[in-house]
Regions:
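Extended lipid/amphipathic-ligand handling interfaces
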Residues: 158-160, 164, 190-200
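Outer-membrane beta-barrel proteins
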Residues: 177-184, 188-194
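Beta-strand-dense domains in secreted/periplasmic systems and polymorphic toxin scaffolds
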Residues: 172, 206-208
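RNase H-like DDE/DDD metal-dependent nuclease/strand-transfer catalytic core used by mobile genetic elements
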Residues: 204-206, 218
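Structured extracytoplasmic
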Residues: 1-157, 178-182, 212-285
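Surface-exposed extracellular loop regions of Gram-negative outer-membrane beta-barrel proteins
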Residues: 166-171, 175
């Protein structure tokens, strides 16, 4: 089946692929939104946001280094906001066989629906295919929906789009069962990974989004804190030599705080936010 091929590819593609290395750049944001009352009446508004720039390097055998090279933030209302460290990085492997998010505080060790060991834990349903055309070639992408056989166990729920020819992941979107979510304040946790075709051959990270909503009632008043993050990955250089100094870096690191501040972002920090997100003002205090 397509799912079995996709599971097998997870273990083989990095060892057998002609993809030897790549470098890329990522641009994104992290935003903290607050909502008082029910959403229909009072929509969430941005309290604090950070704009981020990241350099990415990957090379065989499945080694990588990500370095935060630019960061600026703005706090629109008084707040003490912090983010888990893994929010500052790009997911390079379509999530590992044992999924861990929020530095293991949101979910930890959840079986990936494409992990070879998880085939007996999920049920799968194929939906209508999507046809994509590039010069001289048509790509057929199949959507496969997945959910756990036992909804009371820690597991993922969502869908994955797979290249029918190669079984590579094109898009993966998932949420989680209540049993999988460790922080019981969390109401929703959604992760979406979109890959793009690089050199008309390699499906590599293109866009990633995460949204986590936590409820924290104050004096019986519904209060919700929402973290939204988005990365856009571009400027790929494939099968070029990775410098030794880069290969010596840890999987994630950051330049100095002074260097982060010197990074030149275009426009304003809030310009990176999607237009549907509302900005908090002094009147909201």
């Amino acid at each position: 089946s397509l799912i079995l091929r996709a599971a097998q590819r997870r273990g083989l593609q990095l060892a057998d692929s002609t993809l030897l290395s790549y470098r890329a750049e990522a641009h994104g944001f992290l935003a903290f939104l607050a909502q008082l009352g029910e959403g229909v009446i009072i929509p969430p508004k941005v309290v604090q946001t950070e704009e981020l720039a990241l350099s990415i390097a990957w090379w065989q055998p499945n080694r990588s280094a990500q370095q935060l090279v630019g960061r600026r933030d703005t706090t629109l209302l008084p707040a003490d906001v912090g983010y888990y460290r893994d929010r500052y990085g790009v997911i390079l492997d379509n999530l590992p066989d044992r999924i861990r998010l929020g530095d293991g505080q949101d979910v930890r060790d959840v079986p990936h629906p494409l992990a070879p060991s998880a085939m007996g834990l999920y049920e799968y349903q194929r939906a209508e295919p999507v046809r994509m055309r590039i010069p001289g070639r048509e790509i057929i992408v199949d959507e496969v929906r997945f959910r756990p056989l036992n909804g009371a166990t820690p597991a993922a729920i969502g869908s994955v789009f797979l290249d029918r020819e190669t079984a590579a992941v094109v898009r993966l979107s998932m949420t989680f069962t209540r049993a999988a979510i460790l922080d019981k304040r969390i109401e929703t946790l959604v992760v979406t990974l979109e890959n793009g075709l690089v050199r008309e051959r390699y499906w590599l990270p293109r866009r990633q989004e995460v949204e986590v909503s936590r409820a924290s009632p104050i004096f019986d008043i519904p209060v919700r804190g929402i973290v939204r993050g988005r990365w856009e990955v571009s400027n790929y250089e494939v099968n070029e030599r990775i410098a030794a100094v880069t290969q010596a870096l840890p999987r994630w690191s950051s330049v100095s705080s002074d260097s982060l501040k010197r990074y030149q972002f275009p426009g304003r920090v809030i310009d990176v936010l999607p237009p549907e997100i509302q900005i908090a003002t002094s009147e909201d205090v």
